[in-house]
Amino acid sequence: SFGLCRLRRGFCARGRCRFPSIPIGRCSRFVQCCRRVW
């Protein structure tokens, strides 16, 4: 969910996570939770 993604210091990205971020979960069905690698 959006809140959980925020707690894990991630952000919601539609479709795919773009470099330099990696997927760490989901915000919704078509939205991934991403986190920057650096």
From Swiss-Prot:
GO terms for cellular component: extracellular region. Disulfide bonds join C5-C33, C12-C27, C17-C34. GO terms for biological process: defense response to bacterium; defense response to fungus; killing of cells of another organism. InterPro entries: Defensin_beta-like. Keywords: Antibiotic, Antimicrobial, Defensin, Disulfide bond, Fungicide, Secreted. Its main location: secreted. Secreted into the stomach cavity. It is found in: Secreted. Belongs to the beta-defensin family. Has antifungal activity and antibacterial activity against Gram-positive and Gram-negative bacteria. Involved in the process of food preservation in the stomach during the incubation fast. May also be present during infection. Monomer. This is Spheniscin-2. It comes from Aptenodytes patagonicus.
